[in-house]
Every structure is written in structure tokens, then in C-alpha cells.
């Protein structure tokens, strides 16, 4: 059997395996269960390893498959799939991470009344992301894009009785709608100018207009929570912990970056678009890292770290290195999912407590969980030979050796330092010191569905970087020689961040609580972004609307143009007349003299 046909069959089999828990139970009158859905994803993961291995050893660059669905005689829906290094590598990674998260959710969400529905939503969420990944035309990509958006809305607002969860779900939907405007406008431009939505045909090497590219960047900004459209991502942690783990690791938030990776040949011919990505990513990564420094909610710190890493991926797109951005997506998925699962287990053990200031001494009561949390934080920092190092160090090396503006480089290095600071701060407050919140029940991490997924992801956080980086070939020759200071820049700034975190934590035990200053307020208030955008803008719009509705319609239209308008017209004429005819001799003599003077001047001319 030929390689393309074999790959096509096995990839389709993987997708069909995932669809069985959604399609078969209604058809055969069967009952679904969380365990059956988890086993389905495990099976799909094992199947997906076969086409990935075949593709890696085939030496092919990409294999495309095209079908047409004849919906009505004159209307065809193209279904085009692209099996390249990105989609073939992403399939097993996403399935492995989702399998671990769903196994954890069987324990974490055991008391939920609609747990099967919850698992079906998570499965649909994954299928939408895989559709987006394998799509070879903008139509199918848009289907996956919208599917991911709708499922995120349903999952973030899963606990509908909580006002914060409903607000966060609505916020995610609204911010993503803004991004969707950019994608729809870009698709409209492609359809009208190039008459195609096939990705191979739109990525021509000629100079591309900036407008459709800015639409794609706007779409990625909304979906991947870049600066300006970022507030929904930290708010999304109001959903259940398995949702946060899946959302932040391998599904929705990387969809925007994946869109730019897919359309990268279209993007790389326009320097304005690349510079926009670079500067936007640098600003996003620093802003999110700064906000994470003063947060006390464990899930919020991890959420801001996601936003910061997405900014780093956007910087990599701006450097014209899509393979490196994909490598960071792949390695990031393992340790970010693990961090969320560890935080979920800690929160569950401490009666729902999420404030890291109220935790402490957990390395004695939860040794395995805290060890995995430490591994995840070290991988996030870019500690040598863990998963994050292989992508993060390469990104900063390429950043240091590229001809780019120093502003973006400085912001990214500062954000890298801050990453070490907030990661170590979280580790110290959670694990060291004394117990600050006694648990109502004995803390236990011997439950296999709770601890096995975390251990699997910990293994991935250690091994994945080496494994994936050996399979993804760099698009350009990496810089072979560079000054020592350039090579060690990432390690130096990370070490500075660690020293800063240690100093701050040691001072916090001996000094009085610090007074609030503008810098601390800026970080803890999330850069004043939410009050400015979420309160002032709606307030101005509401007041303006009220004025337009009441004053203009009632007063201006009916009164000013009607009876009051007629009265005002006569009043103005009357005032002019009374001003001229005062009955005083001085006024008449003055008017007479002024008239004579004007007449003489006109005659002389």
C-alpha cells in the first residue's frame, strides 16, 4: 500500500475513533460513560502513533488529500486535509495530553451530576482542535476555529450557578468574536482576490497586501490572548480545572498561533506583518509576566504564565521561525497541563483553597504532586534539559542573533526573568514553610486516576523536548558561533529571576508588609486594563446612548424644530431690533457717525 493512502487511512481512522462516543450511543441506544470516552481517547492516541511514525520515516514534506461533498447539484463543499510535520506531530501530543486530563477528570469531577455530558464536551473540544490542525483549506479551518470557540464558551461556563464562571464564558466569547472579525475579513479578501481558500494556493511568494495579514494577526490576537484581547484568558480559569488544563495546553489558546504557522508562507513575504507579530508578542509576554508577579491565586498565576508563553510563540512567528513556534507549542502542552492538574489536586486537598499564601509545607503531605509541580515550574523557566529548555533557549538564541529592534529583545529577556521569579515564588509558598490551611479530611494522593496522569505528564515534561526537537528539522541553519554572553543570556536572566524570587521571599518573612506603590498596584490591578476597558467604555457608550435617545429625540427634534424653534427665530430678530432702537441720542449719533465714516472710506477707495 502506498504511503499517502496508508497515512490517509490511519489518520481518518484516528478521527473516526474519536467520533464513536458521540455517534454510536444515539444510533445503537447505548449509554456513554466517562471511562469509555477516556479509553476511546487512549485508543486514538495509540492509533495516531502509527501514522506519525510512518510519516517521519517516509521523508515526505506533506501529503494533501482532497474530497468534495456534493451538497446540492451546483454547490460543492471542499474537504481538504493536510498531513505534514505539524499535524502529524500535533495529533499524538494533543491526544496524549487529553487522555491524561480526562483520566484525572474522572476523579476530580466524580461528584458532578452531568459528568458524561462534561466528557462529551471535552471530546468535542478536542475534535474541533484536531480539525483545525489537519485542515488544508480556510473553510475547514474556520469550522474547527468556530467549534473550538463554541465549546470553550460551554466549558468555561460549566458551573452555571457561579456568576464569575458565566461572566468569564461571556468574556471569552466576546473577545474571540473580535478576533473572528479579522479571520472572516481575511477569508473574504482571499475569496475575492485569489478566488480560493486552499492553503497551498494562497501562500504564494509574491508581496502580500498588509490588510488581510493584519486580519489574520487580529484573529490570532483574539484566540491566543495577545495584548489588547488578553483579559479573557486569566478569567477562563473560573471553569473546572480539567477545562483549564485542556484549554491552556493543547487546544484553544494555541489555535491562533497555529493559524499563523499554517499561513506563514503568506505572512513571511510582508515585513510589516512580521514586525507587528514580533512587537505584539514581546509586549504580551512582558505584560502577562508582570501581572503574574503579584497574583496569589494558584490557577491565575498558571493562566498568566500561559499568556506569557503565547507571547513568546508570537515573538517566534515574528522572527520568521514557524517550526520553532510549533516546537514550543508541543513542549509547552506537557508541562502546562501538568501544572494545572497539580494545582487541581492541591485545591481539592485543601477544601477548595486557591490562595498560595494560605498553603505551605505541602512537600511533606503531597510529595509526588509537589515534585511534579516543581518539574513543571522548572520546565517553564527553561531549566536545561527539561522540555521547555529545548524550545525556549533556541527562541532566545535566535532572538539575540537576529537583526531585530532591541526593544522587542529587551522586553522578552525581562519577561524570561520574571517567569523564573513568579514560578519560584509559587513553588516556595506552596511547598515550604508551615501548614497554613488544615484540611478537613486526610490528604491522600494514592488514588491512581489522580496521580497517574500527573506522573505521565511529568515524564513528558522531562523527555518531550529532546524527543520532539530531534524530529522537527530547523528551517534555517542555526547560528553556529556567537559570543558567550549571547549564548548564556537566557540562563543569566533566568538566574537573576531566581535570585530576585529568593530575595523577595526571604524579605517577606522579616519585614513589615510593604506599602502599596504604583508599580505593585500596576501588577496587581492587571495594568488597569480591565477597569479601563470593561467599565469606562460601556459607561461612556451607555450615557451617550441615553443622551441620544432622550435629549435628541424628545427635545431637539420635537421642540427645537417645532414650537420652540419658531419662537427662538422670532426672539433672535426681536433682540437685534431692540438693540438698535434703544431710544437714546448717543446710540443714534454713534450709528450716524459710523455710517458717514464707512461711506467716506468707500468713496475714497
Swiss-Prot record:
GO terms for molecular function: NADH dehydrogenase (ubiquinone) activity. Keywords: Electron transport, Membrane, Mitochondrion, Mitochondrion inner membrane, NAD, Respiratory chain, Translocase, Transmembrane, Transmembrane helix, Transport, Ubiquinone. GO terms for cellular component: mitochondrial inner membrane; respiratory chain complex I. It is found in: Mitochondrion inner membrane. InterPro entries: NADH_DH_su5_C, NADHpl_OxRdtase_5_subgr, ND/Mrp_TM, NU5C-like, Proton_antipo_N. Belongs to the complex I subunit 5 family. Core subunit of respiratory chain NADH dehydrogenase (Complex I) which is composed of 45 different subunits. This is NADH-ubiquinone oxidoreductase chain 5.
Amino acid at each position: 500500500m502506498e504511503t499517502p493512502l496508508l497515512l490517509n487511512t490511519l489518520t481518518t481512522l484516528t478521527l473516526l475513533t474519536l467520533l464513536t462516543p458521540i455517534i454510536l450511543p444515539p444510533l445503537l441506544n447505548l449509554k456513554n460513560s466517562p471511562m469509555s470516552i477516556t479509553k476511546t481517547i487512549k485508543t486514538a492516541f495509540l492509533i495516531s502513533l502509527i501514522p506519525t511514525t510512518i510519516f517521519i520515516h517516509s521523508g515526505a514534506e506533506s501529503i494533501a488529500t482532497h474530497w468534495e461533498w456534493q451538497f446540492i447539484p451546483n454547490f460543492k463543499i471542499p474537504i481538504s486535509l493536510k498531513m505534514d510535520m505539524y499535524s502529524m506531530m500535533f495529533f499524538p501530543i494533543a491526544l496524549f495530553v487529553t487522555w491524561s486530563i480526562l483520566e484525572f477528570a474522572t476523579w476530580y469531577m466524580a461528584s458532578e451530576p452531568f459528568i458524561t455530558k462534561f466528557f462529551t464536551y471535552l471530546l468535542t473540544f478536542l475534535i474541533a482542535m484536531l480539525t483545525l490542525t489537519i485542515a488544508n483549506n480556510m473553510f475547514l479551518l474556520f469550522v474547527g476555529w468556530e467549534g473550538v470557540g463554541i465549546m470553550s464558551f460551554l466549558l468555561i461556563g460549566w458551573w452555571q450557578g457561579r456568576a464569575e464562571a458565566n461572566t468569564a464564558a461571556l468574556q471569552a466569547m466576546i473577545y474571540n468574536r473580535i478576533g473572528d472579525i479579522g479571520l472572516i475579513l481575511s477569508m473574504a479578501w482571499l475569496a475575492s482576490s485569489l478566488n480560493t481558500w486552499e492553503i497551498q494556493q494562497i501562500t504564494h511568494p509574491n508581496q502580500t497586501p498588509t490588510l488581510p495579514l493584519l486580519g489574520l494577526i487580529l484573529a490570532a490576537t483574539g484566540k491566543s490572548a495577545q495584548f489588547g484581547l488578553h483579559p479573557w484568558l486569566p478569567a477562563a480559569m473560573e471553569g473546572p480545572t480539567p477545562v483549564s488544563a485542556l484549554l491552556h495546553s493543547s487546544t484553544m489558546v494555541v489555535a491562533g498561533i497555529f493559524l499563523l504557522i499554517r499561513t506563514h508562507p503568506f505572512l513571511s513575504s510582508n515585513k510589516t506583518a512580521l514586525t507587528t507579530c514580533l512587537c505584539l508578542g514581546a509586549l504580551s509576554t512582558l505584560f502577562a509576566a508582570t501581572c503574574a508577579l503579584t497574583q496569589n491565586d494558584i490557577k491565575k498565576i498558571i493562566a498568566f504564565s500561559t499568556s506569557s508563553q503565547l507571547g513568546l510563540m508570537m515573538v517566534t512567528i515574528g522572527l520568521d521561525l514557524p517550526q520553532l513556534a510549533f516546537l514550543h507549542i508541543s513542549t509547552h502542552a506537557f508541562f502546562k497541563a501538568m501544572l494545572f492538574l497539580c494545582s487541581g489536586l492541591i485545591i481539592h486537598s485543601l477544601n477548595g483553597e486557591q490562595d498560595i499564601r494560605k498553603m505551605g509545607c505541602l512537600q511533606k503531605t503531597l510529595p509526588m504532586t509537589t515534585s511534579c509541580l516543581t518539574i513543571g515550574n522548572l520546565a517553564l523557566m527553561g531549566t536545561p534539559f527539561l522540555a521547555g529548555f529545548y524550545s525556549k533557549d533556541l527562541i532566545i538564541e535566535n532572538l539575540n542573533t537576529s537583526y531585530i529592534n532591541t526593544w522587542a529583545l529587551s522586553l522578552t529577556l525581562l519577561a524570561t526573568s520574571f517567569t523564573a521569579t513568579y514560578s519560584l515564588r509559587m513553588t516556595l509558598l506552596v511547598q515550604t514553610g508551615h501548614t497554613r490551611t488544615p484540611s478537613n479530611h486526610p490528604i491522600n494522593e494514592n488514588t491512581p486516576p489522580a496521580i497517574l496522569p500527573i506522573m505521565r505528564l511529568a515524564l513528558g515534561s522531562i523527555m518531550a523536548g529532546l524527543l520532539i526537537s530531534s524530529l522537527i528539522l530547523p528551517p534555517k541553519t542555526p547560528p553556529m558561533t556567537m559570543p558567550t554572553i549571547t549564548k548564556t543570556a537566557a540562563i543569566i536572566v533566568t538566574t537573576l529571576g531566581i535570585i530576585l524570587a529568593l530575595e523577595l521571599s526571604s524579605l517577606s518573612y522579616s519585614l513589615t508588609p510593604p506599602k502599596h506603590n504604583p508599580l505593585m498596584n500596576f501588577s496587581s490591578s492587571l495594568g488597569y486594563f480591565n477597569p479601563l476597558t470593561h467599565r469606562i467604555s460601556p459607561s461612556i457608550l451607555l450615557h451617550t446612548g441615553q443622551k441620544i435617545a432622550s435629549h435628541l429625540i424628545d427635545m431637539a427634534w420635537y421642540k427645537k424644530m417645532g414650537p420652540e424653534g419658531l419662537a427662538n427665530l422670532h426672539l433672535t430678530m426681536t433682540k437685534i431690533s431692540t438693540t438698535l432702537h434703544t431710544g437714546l441720542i448717543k446710540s443714534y449719533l454713534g450709528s450716524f457717525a459710523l455710517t458717514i465714516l464707512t461711506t467716506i472710506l468707500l468713496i475714497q477707495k
